[in-house]
Amino acid sequence: MDGLRETAAGSGKIGTTGRGIGPAYEDKVGRRAIRFGDLQDLDKLQGRLEKLVDYHNKILVHLYDAKPIPFEDVMDELRNHQGLFQKFHSGTQDLLRGWVKENKKIIFEGAQGSMLDIDHGTYPYVT
């Protein structure tokens, strides 16, 4: 997607790395992203992922006149790396519970801060 966007921009291109970081952030703030924790259960994720791939395929085909990405290719890629995802997944809840057991002080602010944060809030109800 990055490469196609750069080509379409012509002399106005920005020099992207072409690794999909920009489109990934667009999905994130557009509240359609797949998050790391979602990768724990690919069967449960499948419906949302189908919608996301369909969304991007419409852009690829209709805006850039490019070939669509087969959904099964995306699922196969995720299945091939699922062990890696599980290896690096850790729960914030477990971390917080540990701090509580250690009697550490924890401060939360939710009304205007953390709960609205795009990374740590009540996604997708974030700003």
Where are these regions (language model features)?
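Non-transmembrane, aqueous-exposed alpha-helical and coiled segments at domain scale
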Residues: 1-127
